[in-house]
């Protein structure tokens, strides 16, 4: 989004949610900062984990600034709602507004255009958690361990 965008916006969730609310927004803002791109607070909206919320937040953003050309959503579900709103306003994706989500959910592969997203290795992290839990049960030891799991950008048709 950063390479081809000029006017950025973000739809997230409450900061009470550390992973989705805080960390994803922090990551987005740090990428903008590293690329010397300013974003005003009024272009950062907070919604809920639903398509309806993504739709409503995108509607607010576009009414406030019709020239937004790049939108990141904290979840794919919210991004799908935003895409619906953007298309209903007669804008083209990605030509007028490029959109990306996070999560690599199944619906993102089915919509038109297909959603650019970030894939997390949930299966791998689940297996690692199960291994850690099994070790805890079998060894009766609470070994604290932090594992950082990687993610991958999945480029599809919703970005330029």
Cite the ranges covered by each PLM segment.
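Conserved H-loop
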Residues: 38-40, 92
């Amino acid at each position: 989004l950063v390479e081809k965008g000029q006017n950025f916006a973000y739809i997230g969730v409450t900061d009470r949610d550390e992973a989705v609310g805080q960390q994803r927004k922090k990551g987005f803002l740090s990428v903008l900062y590293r690329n010397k791109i300013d974003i005003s607070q009024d272009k950062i909206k907070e919604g809920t984990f639903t398509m309806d919320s993504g739709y409503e937040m995108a509607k607010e953003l576009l009414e406030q600034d019709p020239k937004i050309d790049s939108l990141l959503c904290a979840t794919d579900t919210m991004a799908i709602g935003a895409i619906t709103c953007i298309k209903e306003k007669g804008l083209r994706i990605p030509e007028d507004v490029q959109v990306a989500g996070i999560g690599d959910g199944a619906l993102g592969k089915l919509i038109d255009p297909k959603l650019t997203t970030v894939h997390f290795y949930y299966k791998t992290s689940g297996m690692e958690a199960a291994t850690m839990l099994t070790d805890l049960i079998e060894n009766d030891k609470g070994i604290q361990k932090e594992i950082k799991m990687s993610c991958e950008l999945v480029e599809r048709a919703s970005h330029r």
